[in-house]
């Protein structure tokens, strides 16, 4: 039986491959070998990969974004983009943020729900599936089994020319041909 983690990883690899420009020159594979660029590693703080997301970062808690540690970024990345969705609820979208400077070491908790985030070099946020700008935490239906929430961070070779408030489809289109690497991180939550 294929584990959820392997399925999500395979989906992510397919997504990154689909975002390519058709040329793999200068593209990091994340395997760290053969002189390739340093792989992307960005992790939320306060819980382990595949662990339970602390209540304060959920819709039944303080509903604030978790702090994220940027451990390594490919040298040719200019910006980062982060997408948080729930694959157990038809990829229900909880957060879109892009144009985070690649030299950022830490993304603090509680990013304001504003179109532009001045504290992150003017990063922009998009519209989630709640119809709002910014982060909205996990909020699975009561009684459901734990849902899986995937934080996908993308290393991007440019600053995206995409207006704040954009939706997932618009971000995916803007990323096309500009993704260098992707780092998936999974958390779970139930109520």
Language-model features: locations:
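N-terminus-centered regions that define maturation/targeting leaders and the start
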Residues: 2-15, 19-191
């Amino acid at each position: 039986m294929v584990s959820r983690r392997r399925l999500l990883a395979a989906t992510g690899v397919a997504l990154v491959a689909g975002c390519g420009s058709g040329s793999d020159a200068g593209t990091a594979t994340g395997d760290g070998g053969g002189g390739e660029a340093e792989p992307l590693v960005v992790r939320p703080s306060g819980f382990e990969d595949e662990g339970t997301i602390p209540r304060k970062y959920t819709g039944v808690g303080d509903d604030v974004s978790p702090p994220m540690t940027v451990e390594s970024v490919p040298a040719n990345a200019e910006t980062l983009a982060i997408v948080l969705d729930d694959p157990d609820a038809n990829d229900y979208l909880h957060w879109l943020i892009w144009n985070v400077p690649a030299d950022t070491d830490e993304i603090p908790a509680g990013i304001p729900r504003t179109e532009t985030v001045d504290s992150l070099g003017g990063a922009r946020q998009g519209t989630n599936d709640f119809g709002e700008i910014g982060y909205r935490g996990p909020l699975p239906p009561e009684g459901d089994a734990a849902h899986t929430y995937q934080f996908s961070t993308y290393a991007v070779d440019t600053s995206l020319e995409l207006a704040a408030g954009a939706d997932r489809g618009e971000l995916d289109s803007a990323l096309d041909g500009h993704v260098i690497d992707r780092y998936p991180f999974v958390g779970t939550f139930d109520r």
